[in-house]
Amino acid sequence: MDNKFLKKIIAQSPEDLQIISACCSEAKVKISDIKYLPSNKIFLLSLLRIDREDENNKNSIKSVIKFEFIDSSKSKNIIQNNQNILLELLAIDIFKRNNKFEITLLFSKNRFITLKTEVIEVTLEDQKLEND
């Protein structure tokens, strides 16, 4: 019997965020599944990622990445009018500038979203295993 379980990874440092980035590399994201809630300072990203933790298995996992304490969000080369466009998440990068962190979500075709925050508080939470 396979031990299948859903993961929850919490990142509070740049090193932790690199683990989430590696887990979500090549994940598929619909524009309609990207939400920024400025009054709550939360940025949500629902995605379909490959189960990289199990090398014998290539199941997809429906997951959500939650970024908290986000002061602002900017996107480039993403047409937000067409909600059905499918993006491919390549990596999540971070660097510090003027006592604030800039978290950049890098997508294929030179598309990206930049989030600004004072603290790193990111959660990757699996919702459902696909192809069971």
Regions found by a protein language model. Give the residues of each.
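Surface-exposed, interaction-prone regions used to assemble/regulate multi-protein complexes
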Residues: 1-132
